């Protein structure tokens, strides 16, 4: 909201001098990638940070922009689709080193680049329920021969075994659009 207030005078000047008709706020309405499952989704929605909706966002922004007489454009893509997608991957095998445990899965950085590219956090949960005492700290890595091919590092997680499925959550935004067939892997 502060950014909108700061740029509104510039938009008014541009409208007057150049006849602009649109004001694009862009995106930037984030989603929660971490912690949504700690206490349950329903309880999370009662937190203050969860109260930002398109409606509350509009109620905050429109009074500042409406006097400009411009068409307001919002790009809420991630808010709409971010948590609507999950990447399902299978644990191929486990590698236990002296200092680290690795869960090697069949999805790699070509499927979801965010963790490798800019350390984007995604909850990773087993598709089936696990007893809470069956946990391990592990790196979840893909099958691509790259040191950066990881979906999670030093993650406390259920101790899944070979053949079991994991869901990498919040993969709906940019997951597919940023995917590639790197290393001749199918998308």
Locate each region found by the language model.
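Charged (often Lys/Glu-rich) extended helix/loop segments that serve as interaction or gating elements
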Residues: 60-62, 67-187
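Active-site loop/helix belt of alpha/beta enzymes
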Residues: 1-90
């Amino acid at each position: 909201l502060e950014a909108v207030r700061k740029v509104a005078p510039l938009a008014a000047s541009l409208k007057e001098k150049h006849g602009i008709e649109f004001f694009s706020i862009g995106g930037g309405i984030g989603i929660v990638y971490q912690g949504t499952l700690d206490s349950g989704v329903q309880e999370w929605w009662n937190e203050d940070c969860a109260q930002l909706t398109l409606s509350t966002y509009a109620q905050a922004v429109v009074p500042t922009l409406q006097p400009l007489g411009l068409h307001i454009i919002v790009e809420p893509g991630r808010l709409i689709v971010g948590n609507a997608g999950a990447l399902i991957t299978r644990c191929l095998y486990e590698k236990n080193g002296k200092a680290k445990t690795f869960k090697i899965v069949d999805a790699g950085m070509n499927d979801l680049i965010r963790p490798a590219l800019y350390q984007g956090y995604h909850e990773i949960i087993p598709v089936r329920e696990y007893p809470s005492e069956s946990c391990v700290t592990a790196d979840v890595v893909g099958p691509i021969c790259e040191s950066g091919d990881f979906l999670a590092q030093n993650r406390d997680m259920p101790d899944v075994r070979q053949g079991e499925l994991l869901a990498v959550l919040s993969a709906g935004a940019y997951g597919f659009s940023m995917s590639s067939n790197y290393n001749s892997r199918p998308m």
